[in-house]
């Protein structure tokens, strides 16, 4: 990559000076002062100031001068990220990487907070500590993946959102809303279109010959999991068993045996690939052939989906696009807090493998 254009380089210097508090009294440099400071012409000085206006750090008032905006007076150049899944879901590694890169390209540093923990009580304590730490350190905005798999997760997530809102810190939600559908929280959201994803997977199962479809899930999951469940049910509408939700652990031999006997499914959609991989092992122990006896599908397309026997049919999440979009949305919110609430729902691609279509037929499809 070549050397940055001069005006961008000098704008970056002034941006950092603002965030250090060098202009804390509120007044900022005029065009003439920028020209003298850097020994540049008026056109370049105007471009520098326009960059800072675009960042939301300064305002220019005709006849009055140039001043720091409210954001400029309090800017830290830091964005906080709170995720719950890095130690048990590889899906968020590329998302977090893209978030970090996008922050860096936009002139922000990233404060990373991973609240994953096997202990439910510790997970809640950890995320609440992170909230206070971010507020103490000073952040311009926060990207928050709502916590799940804990009792009263919705209440905890709403408490976290209210804390940031009360402190005047913009918040963008990652992957899931904090409100249960069909309700919508007052916060920006970036995720895949979970309902459409569930519906598309269900349509594939129908086309593969399934007529009795089960959606295997757990309690205390994020609202997005319920959206997937709803999508599967909509896609299975009219079938003898139209996407019935079953709450069970995929490696619970007795529970899966009861489900097979009671519901007689010929297809099982799991809320993610790891759960589907565990289910494949359980079905093998119960003597069920996949996909001949039962078709199995997951969501996310993490590495294990390609390594299972048979490989898993799944829905691939656009991780890099998610990461880049959530940073873009947050920076826009930081610069303009009065924007209307936005939901960016991204597309997800169906990846067909041998857990739903026999190898001989799959070759004909490719």
Predicted regions and their residues:
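Extreme N-terminal segment that seeds HTH/winged-HTH DNA-binding domains in transcriptional regulators
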Residues: 1-40, 46-50, 119-120, 129-136, ...
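Amphipathic helical "hinge" segments at domain boundaries
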Residues: 8, 12-13, 20, 72-144, ...
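Flexible loop/turn connectors
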Residues: 17, 186-187, 257-366
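Beta-hairpin "wing" of winged helix-turn-helix
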Residues: 27-28, 55-63, 67-69
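Periplasmic-binding protein-like
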Residues: 80-82, 138-149, 170-172, 214-217, ...
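Flexible loop/hinge segments that line or gate small-molecule binding clefts
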Residues: 147-197, 274, 300-312
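Hydrophobic alpha-helical segments within soluble ligand-binding/sensing domains
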Residues: 177-180, 184-215, 251-257, 276, ...
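An alpha-beta-alpha
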Residues: 199-239, 342-356
């Amino acid at each position: 990559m070549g050397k940055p254009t001069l005006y961008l380089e000098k704008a970056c210097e002034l941006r950092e000076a603002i965030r250090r508090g060098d202009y804390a009294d509120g007044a900022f440099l005029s065009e003439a002062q920028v020209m003298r400071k850097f020994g540049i012409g008026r056109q370049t000085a105007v471009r520098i100031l326009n960059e800072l206006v675009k960042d939301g750090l300064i305002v220019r008032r005709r006849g009055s001068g140039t001043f720091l905006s409210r954001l400029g007076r309090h800017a830290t150049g830091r964005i906080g990220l709170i995720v719950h899944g890095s130690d048990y879901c590889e899906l968020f590694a590329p998302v977090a990487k893209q978030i970090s890169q996008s922050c860096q390209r936009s002139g922000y540093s990233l404060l990373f907070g991973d609240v994953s923990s096997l202990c439910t009580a510790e997970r809640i304590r950890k995320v609440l500590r992170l909230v206070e730490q971010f507020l103490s350190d000073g952040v311009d905005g926060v990207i928050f993946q709502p916590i799940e798999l804990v009792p009263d997760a919705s209440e905890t997530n709403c408490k976290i959102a209210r804390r940031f809102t009360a402190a005047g810190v913009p918040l963008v939600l990652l992957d899931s809303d904090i409100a249960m559908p069909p309700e919508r929280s007052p916060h920006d959201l970036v995720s895949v279109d979970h309902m459409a994803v569930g519906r598309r997977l269900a349509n594939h199962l129908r086309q593969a010959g399934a007529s009795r479809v089960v959606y295997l899930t757990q309690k205390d999951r994020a609202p997005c999991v319920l959206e997937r469940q709803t999508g599967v049910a909509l896609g299975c509408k009219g079938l003898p068993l139209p996407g019935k939700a079953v709450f069970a652990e995929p490696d619970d031999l007795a529970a899966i045996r009861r489900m097979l006997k009671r519901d007689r499914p010929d297809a099982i959609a799991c809320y993610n690939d790891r759960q589907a991989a565990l289910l494949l092992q359980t079905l093998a122990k119960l003597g069920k052939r996949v996909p001949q006896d039962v078709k199995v599908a997951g969501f996310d397309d993490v590495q294990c989906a390609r390594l299972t026997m048979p490989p898993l049919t799944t829905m691939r999440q656009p991780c890099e696009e998610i990461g880049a979009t959530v940073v873009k949305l947050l920076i826009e919110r930081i610069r303009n807090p009065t924007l209307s609430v936005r939901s960016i729902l991204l597309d997800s691609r169906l990846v067909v493998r041998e857990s739903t279509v026999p190898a001989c037929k799959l070759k004909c499809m490719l």
